[in-house]
């Protein structure tokens, strides 16, 4: 009997995603990359954090283990278009840049690295900044800087003084 792995036959794929991702990582460890990709890419999800996670993981497997940057771009684009927080936007843009760089699409890669580097307070934003501006220091804009009075009051708190030791 063959089990159909489509959204019409899956019950609550959002609840199953965590288990699927754990199994996929185990398959990667066992070097069963194609099976891991099938498990993550046929997730049956259409929205939400599980959808974003599934699309990113599918793109990562496609790029890192299947050596298929075109397939990865498809997944990273879906990821990028369905997230909203800076940490996720920078992550999606970075991986789109990396996929395009591998394809030799330097202009497209730089476009995505620049997009990711707009979020300098994130890991991928910093990686992207280093890719396109290797000798230029990080400069945070005024919206990212902490108000001096707020910082001063924060460091006056007893618990902060204890932890700061």
Which residues does each predicted region cover?
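Extracytoplasmic and endomembrane cell-envelope/extracellular-matrix remodeling and assembly machinery
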Residues: 1-165
């Amino acid at each position: 009997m063959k089990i159909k792995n489509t959204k019409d036959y899956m019950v609550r794929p959002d609840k199953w995603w965590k288990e699927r991702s754990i199994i996929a990582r185990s398959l990667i460890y066992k070097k069963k990359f194609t099976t891991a990709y099938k498990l993550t890419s046929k997730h049956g999800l259409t929205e939400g954090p599980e959808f974003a996670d599934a699309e990113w993981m599918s793109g990562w497997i496609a790029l890192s283990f299947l050596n298929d940057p075109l397939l990865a771009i498809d997944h990273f684009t879906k990821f990028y278009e369905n997230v909203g927080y800076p940490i996720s936007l920078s992550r999606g843009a970075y991986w789109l840049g990396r996929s395009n760089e591998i394809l030799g699409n330097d202009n497209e890669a730089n476009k995505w690295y620049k997009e990711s580097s707009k979020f300098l307070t994130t890991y991928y934003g910093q990686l992207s900044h280093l890719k396109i501006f290797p000798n230029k220091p990080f400069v945070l804009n005024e919206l990212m800087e902490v108000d001096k009075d707020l910082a001063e009051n924060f460091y006056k708190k007893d618990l902060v003084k204890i932890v700061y030791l």
